[in-house]
Amino acid sequence: MWPPSHRQLCLAFLLVCVLSVISFFLHIHQDSFPHGLGLSILCPDRGLVTPPVAIFCLPGTAMGPNASSSCPQHPASLSGTWTVYPNGRFGNQMGQYATLLALAQLNGRRAFILPAMHAALAPVFRITLPVLAPEADSRTPWRELQLHDWMSEEYADLRDPFLKLSGFPCSWTFFHHLREQIRREFTLHDHLREEAQSVLGQLRLGRTGDRPRTFVGVHVRRGDYLQVMPQRWKGVVGDSAYLRQAMDWFRARHEAPVFVVTSNGMEWCKENIDTSQGDVTFAGDGQEATPWKDFALLTQCNHTIMTIGTFGFWAAYLAGGDTVYLANFTLPDSEFLKIFKPEAAFLPEWVGINADLSSLWTLAKP
C-alpha cells in the first residue's frame, strides 16, 4: 500500500495527463473548421455530442431498424459537410437525396439534408440522413456545384469539404450501385404501405370478378408538361396509343394483370384509356398536394408503365419488376437532349416504346 502522499501525487499526475490529451484533441477539431462554426449537435433525444458541425435532428428522422436513437451518426471515417438544394417537386427531391447520399459516400464526406427536403420526404419515407440546422447552413463556407443529370468522372474526385449540390439529378448512374440502400432509404412508412395494399387488395378483374394475379402501376404525367414539352422542349407526353401498346405488352406476358392508373390528369385518363377488357382501374386520386398516396400505390405494384418524369421513374425503380417507358419523346434537335441522356435515365433492362412525334414534325415543317 502506497503512503497517502505518494498516491495523491500519482493521481494528480494522471489527471493532468488526461486533461492534456483531451485539450489536444479539442484543439485539433476546432482548428479543422471555420471560426464560429459550432461543434454541437442538438438532438431531442440525447445529450450533447460533438461532431464537427452544428445540426439538429427533426422528429421522425429515423435510423435503421436496429438503432435505439432517432439522431443518426456518421461513420468516424467520413469528414466534411455536404448537402443539396431541395429544388422541384417530390420526384426531383428524391433524386437529389439519392444523389447526395451516393456522391457523399463515394467521396468520403458526411451528407446532411436541409429542413425543406426533410419536410417533403420524411412524412413518406424512413430516410436516415440528418438535417442541417439553418444557422449552420448560413455560417458554412460552401462551394456550390451544379450537377448535370448523369454521373461523370469528376464527381468521383471532389475535394471540397463543404459542398452544396444543386440541379435536378435523377439518374441511376449516380446511385444504382447502392440500390438496396436507396430502397431502404425510400421505404414507405407502415401506414402508407398498408393503406396502398388495402386498396390493391380490393381490386377485382371486371370480366370475372377474380383477384388479379399481377398488378401493373401506370403513371400518366400531364399537368404542366402539356405546355412545357411541346413549347419549350419540342417533345410530347404519353398519349392513348402509347398506353395501349404498353398495356398490350404486359397482357402478352402476364396472366390476368390489372392496370392501376394514377395521374395528375385523371379526367383525361378516364376519357382516353381503353377499359373494354375489364382490367383497368383508376385508383389514384391525382392530388399533386399529396403525391405520396399515388406513389405508394405504384410502388406496391409488381410492374410499372411510366410516361415521362421523375415521379414515374422512382415508382418504377422502387417497385422493381418490368418497366415500360416512353422513349424518344423529343425531336432530335431538342435542347432537352443537352441536359437529359436517355441511356442514363432509364435502366438498360427497361423496355422503351417510341413516342408518336407526328404532331411535332408537322409543326417543324417550313
UniProtKB/Swiss-Prot annotation:
A Pfam cross-reference name: Glyco_transf_11
Cytoplasmic side: 1-8
Coiled coil: none
Pathway assigned in UniProt: Protein modification; protein glycosylation
Residue ranges annotated as Lumenal topological domain: 26-366
Catalytic activity: a beta-D-galactosyl-(1->4)-N-acetyl-beta-D-glucosaminyl derivative + GDP-beta-L-fucose = an alpha-L-Fuc-(1->2)-beta-D-Gal-(1->4)-beta-D-GlcNAc derivative + GDP + H(+); a ganglioside GA1 + GDP-beta-L-fucose = a ganglioside Fuc-GA1 + GDP + H(+); a beta-D-Gal-(1->3)-beta-D-GlcNAc-(1->3)-beta-D-Gal-(1->4)-beta-D-Glc-(1<->1')-Cer(d18:1(4E)) + GDP-beta-L-fucose = alpha-L-fucosyl-(1->2)- beta-D-galactosyl-(1->3)-N-acetyl-beta-D-glucosaminyl-(1->3)-beta-D-galactosyl-(1->4)-beta-D-glucosyl-(1<->1')-N-acylsphing-4-enine + GDP + H(+); a neolactoside nLc4Cer(d18:1(4E)) + GDP-beta-L-fucose = a neolactoside IV(2)-alpha-Fuc-nLc4Cer(d18:1(4E)) + GDP + H(+)
Primary subcellular site in the record, as a coarse category: Golgi
Membrane topology per record: Single-pass type II membrane protein
Protein's cellular compartments: Golgi apparatus, Golgi stack membrane
Catalytic activity, EC: 2.4.1.69, 2.4.1.344
One GO process term, biological-process aspect: positive regulation of sprouting angiogenesis
Keywords tagged on the record: Glycoprotein, Glycosyltransferase, Golgi apparatus, Lipid metabolism, Membrane, Signal-anchor, Transferase, Transmembrane, Transmembrane helix
Carbohydrate-modified residues: 66, 302, 328
Cellular component terms (Gene Ontology): Golgi cisterna membrane
Annotated TM spans: 9-25
Example of a GO MF term: galactoside 2-alpha-L-fucosyltransferase activity
Function summary: Catalyzes the transfer of L-fucose, from a guanosine diphosphate-beta-L-fucose, to the terminal galactose residue of glycoconjugates through an alpha(1,2) linkage leading to H antigen synthesis that is an intermediate substrate in the synthesis of ABO blood group antigens. H antigen is essential for maturation of the glomerular layer of the main olfactory bulb, in cell migration and early cell-cell contacts during tumor associated angiogenesis. Preferentially fucosylates soluble lactose and to a lesser extent fucosylates glycolipids gangliosides GA1 and GM1a.
Family affiliation: Belongs to the glycosyltransferase 11 family.
Identification of the protein by name: Galactoside alpha-(1,2)-fucosyltransferase 1
Gene name, Swiss-Prot/TrEMBL: FUT1
